[in-house]
Amino acid sequence: MRDAVTSLIKNYDVAGRYFDRNAIDTLKDYFDSGTARVQAAAAINSNAAALVKQAGSKLFEELPELIRPGGNAYTTRRLAACLRDMDYYLRYATYALVAGNTNVLDERVLQGLRETYNSLGVPIGPTVRGVQILKDLVKEQVAGAGIANTTFVEEPFDHITRELSERDV
């Protein structure tokens, strides 16, 4: 797992270059948002279970066929698996948010997930929608914690949805 700083250093080291203005600006932005990132993580951590439960409720309200007989979240076991996965997305998105880098999502969550879901018959569309709902709820939670600029919260969730979404459709 890398954070924004180690990724930047690695890229410049591989190229054998000193930091240029872009690198310095990237570092400055990362460190300037550091306190907000930690505060956001604290707000998420203190309400993680409620955020997942609320996201699940909203998802099933929007897509009730998922919890009806024959739906992918029908039966207690499948519903629990869906909420467990949403919790994983939230936890790893929080790690990526603090790191300022989505590398942990690629390494620990996304590699092979789409193929696994397809092989198990888990619909990707509702999964993507669930992550989008989580993003909206987290932004509300973070704003409620007094963090004015919540745009940095979007990137981990947007990364998950981009990587899971259909391509070349």
Curated annotation (Swiss-Prot):
CC per GO annotation: phycobilisome; plasma membrane-derived thylakoid membrane
Q: According to the lineage, what is the superkingdom?
A: Bacteria
UniProt gene name? apcF
Q: Name one Pfam family in it.
A: Phycobilisome
Q: Which family does it belong to?
A: Belongs to the phycobiliprotein family.
**InterPro entries named in the record:** Allophycocyanin_b, Globin-like_sf, Phycobilisome_asu/bsu, Phycobilisome_asu/bsu_sf
List GO BP terms, alphabetically: photosynthesis
Instruction: Give the membrane topology, semicolon-separated if more than one.
Output: Peripheral membrane protein
Name the UniProt record assigns to this protein: Allophycocyanin subunit beta-18
Binding-site residues, (2R,3E)-phycocyanobilin: 82
Record text on subunit structure and interactions:
Heterodimer of ApcE and this beta chain.
Localization? Cellular thylakoid membrane
Q: How is it modified after translation?
A: Contains one covalently linked bilin chromophore. The chromophore is added by phycocyanobilin lyase CpcS 1.
SUPFAM superfamilies in the cross-refs: Globin-like (SSF46458)
- Sites where N4-methylasparagine occurs are at 72
Q: What does this protein do?
A: A variant beta-allophycocyanin (AP) which forms a complex with ApcE, a phycobilisome terminal emitter that influences energy transfer to photosystem II.
**What UniProt keywords are attached to this protein's entry?**
Antenna complex, Bile pigment, Chromophore, Electron transport, Membrane, Methylation, Photosynthesis, Phycobilisome, Thylakoid, Transport
Q: Does the keyword Transport apply?
A: yes
Q: Does the keyword Transport apply?
A: yes
